[in-house]
C-alpha cells in the first residue's frame, strides 16, 4: 500500500507544519494565523488540482493531489475531513489514469480512516461508501454489491441521499442481471426522489428515464412508453433544450414507437432528437451515432431501404475515421450494412460484408463473444436465404453452442438462435424437427418472460405458420387468433407483426373454407399494410396476392 506521508511537501508548508506541531499556541492570534495559512495552502492546492485536471494534465493533478493529502494529514490530522476528501480525490485521479489497484487501496484506506474517525453510519463515511461503490461498479459489479448495499442499509429513512443510494443499488442489480430486483429498487428510488425533491427535479426525472429504460429492456413497452411520455413534458419544462436526458429520452421513446409500429411518431421523434443532438454535441457524438443507427432500422422496418443504407453508411464512415477498421463498432456497422444489402437481394455484397464484419469481431473480441455470435447468426440467415442449408446449419449450431456457453441456455440470444434453427429445419421441409425446436423455445420463453411476452408470442406465431405450411389449419387458427389479439394490444393494430398475424389468420380461414372471415381479415391486413408501408412493400404485395387467390376461390 502506498505511503502517502512519504511524498515531498512544499518547503513553506513543511515549515508551517513543524511550527504547528511544536508550539503550545500560547499566542492564540499566532496559532490562528498558522491554521489559516494551512487552510489557505490546502485550498490553493485544491484549485491547482482542479485546473490541472481541466487541462487534461492528469499526472500533474496526481502529484498535486498527493501533496494535498500529505498537507491535510499533517496540518489537520489523518482522520480529518480534509484528509479524507483529499484521499478520495487522489483515488479518483488514479481511476482516471486507469491505475485501478492504487485507487482501490486508497478507497479502502479512506473507508477505514473514516469509520475510525466518524463512525460507520456517519455522513462522512457514507459518502466514502458511495464513491467506493461507484468505483467498484465500474470495474466489477459483484465486488460493488456489498459496498453499495451497506451504504443503503446505514442510511436513515429521512436522509436525502437515500434515494441516490437506491438508484445506485438498482443500477448494480441491473449489471448483475437481477432485473426484477433492479426494477423494484428503482421504483422505490423514484418514489423517494419524488418525495424528497419533487416531480420536476432533474434527479427525479433522470430516475424516471432510467426506470423507463429498464422497462424497455424487458420488453415492457407499454410501461416504458407511459413513463417516457410522462417524463418528457416535465423535462422540457425544467431542463435546457439541448439537455442530454431530454435527447436520450426522445430517442428511447422513438425506439419504443418503432417497436410498436407507430412509425410516423417514431420518425418524428428520431429526427427531433437527431437535430438536437447534432446541434448540442456534433456529428461524431455517440448519441448522434445511436440515433442514426436506430433511424436506419426504422427505415428498414418500413421498407425504405435506400434511406436505411444512407444512414448506416454515415455511421460506418464516421466510425471508420474515429475508431479504425479493426474496431468492434466498425464491424457492427458493416453488419448493419450487410443486413440492408440482404434485404435488397444483393446477396453477394451482403455475404462479403458479413464475413468481413465477423473476421473483425473475432479478431477484436474473440469468437466466444456476444457480438461475434450476432454476426454469425446473420451470416447463417443470409446463407439460408440463398438455400445454402448445408452451410447455414453448422453456423447456426456453432452460434447457438457459443451463446449457450457464454450467456447461458436461457439467454434471449440463445433462445433466438434456437428459433432460427427451427426456421431452418422448416425451410428444409423437416417439419418434425422444426416443431420440436419451436415448442422447446416457446416453453423456455414462457418460463423466463411469461406467456404474453413479445418473444414468446413471436415463437408461437412461428409455430402457427409451420402448422399453416403443414396443412394443420385447425391447430394454426387458435394460435394466430391469440397472437393477433395480444399483439394488437401490445404493439398496436398497425404494427408489422400484428398485420402479419392477421393476414396469416385470413389464410388459415381460407384453407378451412371460412371465406367471409378470410376476406375480412386479409382485406384488413392489406389496408393496414398499404397505409403503413405503401403499395410496393413486400408485405403489401403478399396481402394483394392472398386476396387475389381468395377471389379466385370465391
PLM features: residue spans?
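TPR-repeat structural position
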Residues: 58, 100, 141-142, 179, ...
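N-terminal leader/linker segments that initiate helical-solenoid repeat arrays
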Residues: 27-63, 70, 81, 85
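Bacterial N-terminal signal peptides that target proteins for export
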Residues: 2-15
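Amphipathic alpha-helical segments of tetratricopeptide repeats
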Residues: 69-73, 111-116, 152-153, 190-195, ...
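Conserved alpha-helical positions within TPR/SEL1-like repeat arrays
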Residues: 43-54, 81-96, 123-137, 160-175, ...
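Bacterial N-terminal signal peptides
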Residues: 13-24
Amino acid at each position: 500500500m502506498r505511503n502517502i506521508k512519504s511524498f515531498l511537501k512544499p518547503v513553506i508548508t513543511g515549515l508551517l507544519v513543524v511550527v504547528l506541531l511544536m508550539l503550545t499556541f500560547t499566542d492564540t492570534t499566532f496559532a490562528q494565523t498558522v491554521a489559516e495559512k494551512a487552510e489557505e495552502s490546502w485550498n490553493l492546492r485544491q484549485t491547482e488540482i482542479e485546473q490541472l485536471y481541466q487541462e487534461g494534465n492528469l499526472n500533474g493533478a496526481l502529484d498535486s493531489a498527493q501533496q494535498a493529502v500529505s498537507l491535510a494529514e499533517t496540518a489537520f490530522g489523518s482522520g480529518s475531513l480534509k484528509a479524507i476528501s483529499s484521499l478520495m480525490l487522489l483515488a479518483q485521479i488514479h481511476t482516471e489514469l486507469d491505475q485501478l489497484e492504487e485507487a482501490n487501496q486508497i478507497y479502502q484506506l479512506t473507508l477505514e480512516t473514516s469509520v475510525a474517525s466518524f463512525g460507520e453510519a456517519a455522513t462522512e463515511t457514507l459518502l466514502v461508501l458511495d464513491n467506493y461503490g461507484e468505483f467498484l461498479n465500474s470495474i466489477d459489479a459483484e465486488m460493488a454489491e456489498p459496498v453499495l448495499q451497506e451504504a443503503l442499509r446505514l442510511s436513515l429513512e429521512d436522509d436525502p441521499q437515500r434515494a441516490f443510494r437506491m438508484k445506485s443499488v438498482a443500477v448494480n442489480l441491473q449489471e448483475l442481471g437481477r432485473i426484477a430486483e433492479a426494477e423494484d429498487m428503482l421504483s422505490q428510488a423514484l418514489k423517494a426522489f419524488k418525495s424528497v425533491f419533487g416531480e420536476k427535479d432533474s434527479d427525479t426525472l433522470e430516475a424516471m428515464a432510467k426506470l423507463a429504460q429498464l422497462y424497455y429492456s424487458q420488453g415492457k413497452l407499454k410501461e416504458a412508453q407511459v413513463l417516457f411520455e410522462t417524463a418528457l413534458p416535465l423535462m422540457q419544462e425544467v431542463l435546457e433544450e439541448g439537455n442530454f436526458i431530454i435527447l436520450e429520452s426522445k430517442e428511447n421513446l422513438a425506439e419504443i414507437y418503432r417497436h410498436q409500429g407507430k412509425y410516423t411518431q417514431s420518425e418524428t421523434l428520431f429526427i427531433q432528437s437527431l437535430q438536437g443532438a447534432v446541434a448540442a454535441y456534433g456529428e461524431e457524438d455517440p448519441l448522434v451515432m445511436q440515433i442514426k443507427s436506430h433511424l436506419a432500422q426504422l427505415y428498414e422496418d418500413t421498407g425504405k431501404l435506400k434511406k436505411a443504407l444512407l444512414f448506416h453508411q454515415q455511421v460506418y464512415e464516421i466510425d471508420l475515421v474515429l475508431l479504425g477498421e479493426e474496431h468492434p463498432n466498425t464491424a457492427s456497422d458493416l453488419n448493419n450494412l450487410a443486413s440492408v444489402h440482404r434485404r435488397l437481394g444483393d446477396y453477394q455484397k451482403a455475404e462479403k460484408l458479413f464475413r468481413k464484419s465477423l473476421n473483425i469481431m473475432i479478431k477484436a473480441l474473440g469468437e466466444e463473444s456476444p457480438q461475434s455470435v450476432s454476426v454469425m447468426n446473420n451470416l447463417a440467415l443470409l446463407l439460408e436465404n440463398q438455400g445454402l442449408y448445408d452451410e447455414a446449419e453448422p453456423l447456426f449450431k456453432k452460434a447457438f453452442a457459443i451463446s449457450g456457453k457464454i450467456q447461458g441456455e436461457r439467454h434471449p440470444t440463445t433462445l433466438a438462435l434456437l428459433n432460427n434453427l427451427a426456421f431452418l429445419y422448416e425451410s428444409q421441409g423437416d417439419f418434425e424437427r422444426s416443431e420440436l425446436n419451436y415448442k422447446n423455445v416457446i416453453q423456455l420463453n414462457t418460463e423466463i418472460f411469461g406467456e404474453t411476452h413479445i418473444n414468446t408470442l413471436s415463437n408461437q406465431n412461428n409455430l402457427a405458420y409451420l402448422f399453416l405450411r403443414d396443412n394443420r389449419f385447425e391447430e394454426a387458427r387458435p394460435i394466430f387468433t391469440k397472437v393477433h389479439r395480444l399483439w394488437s394490444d401490445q404493439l398496436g393494430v398497425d404494427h408489422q407483426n400484428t398485420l402479419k398475424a392477421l393476414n396469416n389468420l385470413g389464410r388459415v380461414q381460407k384453407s378451412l373454407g371460412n371465406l367471409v372471415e378470410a376476406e375480412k381479415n386479409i382485406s384488413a391486413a392489406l389496408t393496414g399494410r398499404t397505409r403503413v408501408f405503401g403499395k410496393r412493400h413486400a408485405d403489401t404485395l403478399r396481402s394483394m396476392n392472398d386476396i387475389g387467390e381468395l377471389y379466385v376461390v370465391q
